[in-house]
């Protein structure tokens, strides 16, 4: 499957025009990386949100990390979830749910009570989340079934990125094995997709933006690795973490329609 040049161009142009504002419920260390992913993909960052109507209306995406929800901030997060409109998008990162037992019921509660548009995690994390609802389905069917039941889009990070809205299934390559700083890489990707979905008004637009931003991220990885290989042996990668990270961000900022369309290899399946 290949995305059309018109759809890619429309999404990238709208991204630059709107500059979606992402509110990150994150610690300072993670926020530093997230901010770079968001800004380099034409978004704006907000780490503190006043309770004024204007502040809430200006927010495009609410980004929540499950492993950062604490007793002292859960009330503020829930207030934000209750205040946002249907035009605003919520992204939940399930990082740590498979390891932190007391976070599982919290995640389940948030999904049941609020409109969570996009849920991201590893296969282990998403499987843990799905197991809270049902244990009867086969793996791929449970991913689609979970997305359909909860009216959300799932992103599963593995050897390939798996994206489903409950009906369509998409697979896009992942190239993170060449990057020594995996946490930085994951935070950048999360920032990119948080920015990308901030322009969306419905689920189909969310899927389209996720496909484009995930492709852009993969291509940026390939390009930055290519630049490194021209200068260093593979053994020197770990000694140049900052440089490869900077190359990645530069390639993200330069991404255009032609480059995404020229690649465009997406595995696609549809089931009712």
Where are these regions (language model features)?
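General beta-strand structural signal in soluble alpha/beta enzymes
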Residues: 24, 45-48, 90-94, 118-123, ...
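Glycine-rich phosphate/adenosyl-contacting loop at the front of the ribokinase-like
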Residues: 1-39
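Active-site cofactor/substrate anionic-group-binding motifs, chiefly glycine-
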Residues: 29-86
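Conserved beta-alpha-beta core of the PfkB/ribokinase-like small-molecule kinase fold
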Residues: 61-63, 69-141
């Amino acid at each position: 499957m290949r995305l059309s040049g018109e759809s890619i161009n429309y999404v990238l142009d709208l991204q630059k025009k709107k500059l979606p504002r992402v509110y990150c419920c994150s610690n300072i260390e993670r926020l530093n990386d997230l901010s770079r992913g968001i800004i380099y993909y034409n978004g704006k960052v907000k780490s503190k949100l006043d309770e004024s109507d204007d502040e809430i209306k200006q927010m495009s995406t609410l980004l929540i990390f499950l492993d950062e929800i604490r007793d002292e901030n859960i009330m503020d997060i829930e207030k934000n979830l209750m205040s946002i409109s249907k035009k605003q998008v919520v992204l939940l990162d399930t990082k740590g749910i498979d390891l932190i037992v007391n976070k599982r019921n919290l995640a389940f509660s948030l999904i049941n009570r609020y409109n969570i548009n996009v849920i991201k995690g590893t296969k282990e994390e998403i499987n843990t989340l799905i197991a809270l609802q049902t244990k009867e389905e086969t793996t791929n069917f449970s991913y689609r079934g979970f997305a359909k039941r909860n009216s959300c889009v799932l992103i599963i990070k593995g050897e390939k990125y798996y994206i489903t809205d409950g009906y369509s299934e998409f697979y896009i390559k992942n190239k993170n094995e060449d990057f020594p700083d995996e946490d930085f890489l994951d935070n950048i990707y999360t920032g990119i997709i948080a920015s990308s979905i901030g322009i969306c008004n419905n689920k189909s637009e969310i899927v389209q933006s996720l496909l484009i931003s995930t492709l852009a991220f993969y291509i940026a990885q390939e390009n930055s690795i290519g630049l490194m290989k021209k200068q260093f042996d593979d053994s020197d990668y770990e000694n140049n973490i900052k440089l490869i990270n900077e190359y990645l961000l530069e390639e993200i900022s330069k991404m255009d329609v032609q480059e995404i369309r020229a690649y465009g290899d997406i595995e696609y399946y549809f089931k009712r």
